[in-house]
């Protein structure tokens, strides 16, 4: 078998089989297939597409290119959730404790942030002392004992994905739905959970900018998971405005704790209840109305918040900051961005908000950048809100005053104020399961 023939077959619109995909992917991981040939295959896939069966086979090969985590040592159904990313996307810190408090095991591996999108592991490490690297034995023991652990992704899972993504990033082949679906699902399958809920974000601050693309990505990922015997569903959620009011690691942890204590922003609370409810449905806890009520009840009785504190304590975190957000270390400097005129916030580009937060030190511009956990933005006025000239739109936080100018310029570049209000998008557009699409 030759890589040349595999490239030519896909270039001409052919369908690759498992053996060919395995030869290409495993050869690339081993160093036998050079970058230029894998680049050519990725571009051929980008231009020609893949059948659902091909995408499922590619995902399987990628998943098996590294360690496959066997969670059978953990009793009961294990549930996982993946978000395709966004700004102010702090839902994992809310829904994982909710679901665990309802008796479903959460053994989750999460990632770090890059560019305008934040990462769950960075947010967790904003809680002083929190360990996000556990041995497998520690991870399993914690989930068996308290029902929940969230740790950083192992570099040994879906090894092919890391190499292939780095290549896609520099060869203009990132925006290909079969390649996005196989990248995400290879890691989810390797991580071993029985039930997987996918949060496919859509809008300015998301990778998928339109509903058709988001639905197709969701459909393909659900099909992959179902083909591999997992219970999978996806929600298409809005990312035309950040969730909640805070962007930045410690700021987002504080806001997440407010939701778990029943006093969080309504948009973030609603999306989290929908996500948690759907995870509970996948885990066999009942239909959606039943599971929604279950999720609401563990917030109301405080058990979800206590479950979150239990998780952080087990991983070495100082939970006093969870109980009292004022105990988080604060940024040295703040800056108020005020409205230039009266009117409605008609547009507030979410990617620019995320990039402004990163410029303040809350995110990474490059992978090796360090993070200032206290830095970030608190939004006082969001998309659709009315504002008066001179009124504060948001507060910027940083440990270096010189960072404000570039961040303010970035934020202002995406801000439009008009006399008429915009049409606000729904929080959740649709649910995608193996049975089809349910639009809301």
Where are these regions (language model features)?
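Glycine/serine-rich anion-binding loops at beta->alpha junctions
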Residues: 77-100, 104-116
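Alpha-helix C-terminal capping segments
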Residues: 47, 93-107, 187-192, 227-228, ...
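Acidic, glycine/proline-rich low-complexity segments that act as flexible tails and inter-domain linkers
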Residues: 1-88, 259, 309-314, 318, ...
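A glycine-rich helix N-cap at a beta->alpha junction
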Residues: 123-149, 219-225, 229
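General beta-strand structural signal in soluble alpha/beta enzymes
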Residues: 106-110, 132-135, 150-153, 197-200, ...
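Phosphate/diphosphate-binding glycine-rich loops and adjacent basic-rich segments that engage nucleotide
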Residues: 144-193
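Well-ordered secondary-structure scaffolds
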Residues: 5, 17, 68, 78, ...
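Short acidic, glycine/serine/threonine-rich loops at helix termini
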Residues: 92, 110, 117-122, 154-155, ...
């Amino acid at each position: 078998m030759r890589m040349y023939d595999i490239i030519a077959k896909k270039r001409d619109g052919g369908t690759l089989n498992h053996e060919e995909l395995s030869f290409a992917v495993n050869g690339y991981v081993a160093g036998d297939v050079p970058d230029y040939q894998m680049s050519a295959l990725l571009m051929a896939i980008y231009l020609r597409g893949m059948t659902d069966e091909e995408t499922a086979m590619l995902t399987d090969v990628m998943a098996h290119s590294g360690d496959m985590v066997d969670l059978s040592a953990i009793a009961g159904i294990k549930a996982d959730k993946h978000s395709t990313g966004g700004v102010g996307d702090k839902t994992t810190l809310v829904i994982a404790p909710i679901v665990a408090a309802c008796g479903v095991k959460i053994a989750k591996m999460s990632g770090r942030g890059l560019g305008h999108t934040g990462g769950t592991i960075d947010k967790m490490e904003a809680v002083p002392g929190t360990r996000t690297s556990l041995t497998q034995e520690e991870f399993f023991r914690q989930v068996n004992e308290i029902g929940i652990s969230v740790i950083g992704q192992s570099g040994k899972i879906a090894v092919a994905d890391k190499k292939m993504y780095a290549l896609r990033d520099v060869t203009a082949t990132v925006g290909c739905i079969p390649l996005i679906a196989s990248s995400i699902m290879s890691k989810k399958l390797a991580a071993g959970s029985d039930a997987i809920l996918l949060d496919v974000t859509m809008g300015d601050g998301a990778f998928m900018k339109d509903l058709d693309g988001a639905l197709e990505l969701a459909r393909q990922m659900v099909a992959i998971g179902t083909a591999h015997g997992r219970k999978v569903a996806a929600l298409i959620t809005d990312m035309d405005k950040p969730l909640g009011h805070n962007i930045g690691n410690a700021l987002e942890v504080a806001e997440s704790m407010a939701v778990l204590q029943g006093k969080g922003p309504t948009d973030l609370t609603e999306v989290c209840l929908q996500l948690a409810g759907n995870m509970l449905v996948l885990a066999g806890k009942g239909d959606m109305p039943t599971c929604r009520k279950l999720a609401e009840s563990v917030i109301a009785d405080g058990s979800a918040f206590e479950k979150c504190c239990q998780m952080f304590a087990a991983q070495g975190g100082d939970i006093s900051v969870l109980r009292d957000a004022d105990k988080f270390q604060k940024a040295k400097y703040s800056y108020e961005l005020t409205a230039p005129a009266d009117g409605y916030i008609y547009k507030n580009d979410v990617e620019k908000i995320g990039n402004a937060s990163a410029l303040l030190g809350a995110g990474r511009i490059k992978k090796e950048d360090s993070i200032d956990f206290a830095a970030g933005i608190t939004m006082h006025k969001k998309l659709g809100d009315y504002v008066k000239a001179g009124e504060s739109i948001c507060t910027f936080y940083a440990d270096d005053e010189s960072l404000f100018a570039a961040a303010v310029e970035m934020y202002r570049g995406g801000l439009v104020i008009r006399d008429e209000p915009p049409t606000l998008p729904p929080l959740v557009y649709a649910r995608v399961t193996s049975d089809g699409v349910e639009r809301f």
